[in-house]
Each structure stands twice: as C-alpha cells, then as structure tokens.
C-alpha cells in the first residue's frame, strides 16, 4: 500500500527523497492503549530511517488501513518530515511545535488519499466527506465540552442529533475528548486551514499548480498559519 501511495501522490505532490521505511505492528499487550497508527519521527541526524507503527486491533477495513498509511506515511507525516528536511529547513524547527500544521497536513493528505485508492470517484468522495464530517463532530464536541462547558446531558443531546444514541458509544467518545482538551481541533481545524488556503490561492493565481502549492508548504515547514499562508503566497508568485 505504501508503494502504491508513493506512486499515486506524484500527480499532486513533489517527488520525495529516497528513504527507508519500516512498518511495525503494535504488540497486542499495548494495543488497547495506543492510537490506531503512529509515525516515529526520524532523528534530525538520520532522516533516512523511518518507522510507522500499525495497531492491528484498531484497523478493520482495507480503505481504513490505506488512509491511515497515507496519514502517517505518504503524503502525511513521514513524507512531510523528509521533504521539509531535504529542502534545508533549519534544524531549530525540530524544537518547535505547530500541531495545527503537522496534524492538519496529515489529515488534509489523508482526505486526498481516498482518491488514490482505486475506488469509484463517487464512492471516494462519499467516504472522504464522511470522514471529514465525523471529524467535525468530534471537534465541535471538543469545543462544546472544553470551551462552553457542556454538561453530560447537553453532550448526549448533541450526539443524539446526529444519530448517536448509544450510551456506551457516547461515553467512549467523550472520554477520548476529556483526555486531551483541544486535541481534535489540531486535526480538523488544521485540515480546514489547508483546504481554505488552497482554494483561496487557486482563485488568486490563474496558473495555480497543486503540486507547487504543496511544495511551497513543505519548503516552509511547520509554522503558524498566518506565516505559512504569506510565505506560500510569495513562493507561488
């Protein structure tokens, strides 16, 4: 699947540098406590060795597995890390944390990957929009609970509006949101910022190139969106 992604993304993304990728599987003893998948960021002095861990207990369909590898690998975290490094980004960036950029980019590319899976275009669009809608619900509940102070009843009523009435399911979702306030916003809001930036710059530039847009983002590297948009706009002129 990674090999397919590496080939398919070349229509929309610049070619990545050569690197080694090891796919590892989470030990069953830890599967209950770890994310569905995660990328171990390569050290700055050895960017050529990369690892992606897959939690088999939380992957149940081929398309889920495919888009997860896109999020963590190509053109997601791994790809962004090695490309930004190959473009000569200052090493000090590794000390800074811009989760809206890193997780927003990975989510943005995950959404793109539905169209690289060989699915019927209408089905790919449906699955992509369903994934985006699901993330939007989690992000809205995150804001509701941690900013507006939703009580249990208000939170349950929110999920019920969207057909989620099972008490155990609502509790599981709520527990995830309570564990890390604001966590879902870096994924969903970050994703929206990249989409909005792409749409806006495409309107401004008649010769807009998606691949050049992505390259400008990667060359800039993790940064605040206010800085990123200005820098990308300058690079596309």
Kindly give the residue locations of the regions a language model identified.
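Long, His/Glu/Asp-enriched segments that create or flank divalent metal/ion-associated functional microenvironments
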Residues: 1-237
